Amino acid sequence: MSGEIVNRVANSPLITMDLTDYAPTKPISVLDIKEFLFEEIFLKEKEFRASLKEFDFSNYTNKVVALNCSSDAIVPMWAFMLVTSYLNTANSEIHFGKKEDVFQQIFADNIDSIDPSEFEGKKVIVKGCGQIPLTETLYIAITKKLQNTVSSLMFGEACSAVPVFKKK
């Protein structure tokens, strides 16, 4: 018997997928509509439009923007459309929501853009931890994306994987 140690994990056909590889890489800027509201409470159309005209939207050029309103004000839908029209001229990538929500939305979109054919018939382990906190939504998205393609889908690490799905 040889004393050689064999790394069975390295020699296995398993593919380890780290969802953090699909995390958004561009920084997300926040534009809070409350800054354009009268006393940050309600919208006066004339003043709202005037403040938007005076605002320097060039700070958002070619950036990802989380557009939201952090106050409890009731903001009409057209106000978000109007702000979006200004951001569009700055070539911004605009999403509605808080910064973290937009991050998760883009993250899920990145997972959705994965080509499942590259995992056709393979055994895939989705890592359970990484540098970025991952939400249940992301694990649901990858399961939906890969289940009909892979031969086996697992969660965790190769040394302690939890079976999720196995093609029969």
Where are these regions (language model features)?
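N-terminal, charge-rich interaction modules
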Residues: 1-74, 91, 149-152, 156-157, ...
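Peripheral peptide segments
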Residues: 42, 104-111, 136, 143
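A domain-level signal for the structural core that forms small-molecule/cofactor-binding pockets
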Residues: 48, 52-53, 94, 128, ...
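Short glycine-rich or small-residue beta-strand-to-loop segments that form or flank ligand, phosphate
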Residues: 64-70, 95-97, 123-129
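Gly/Ser/Thr-rich loops at beta-strand to alpha-helix junctions
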Residues: 70-77, 129-136, 160-161
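Long, charge-dense
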Residues: 79-118, 156-161
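Short, non-transmembrane amphipathic alpha-helical segments
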Residues: 80-88, 138-147
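Extended, charge-rich low-complexity interaction segments
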Residues: 116-140
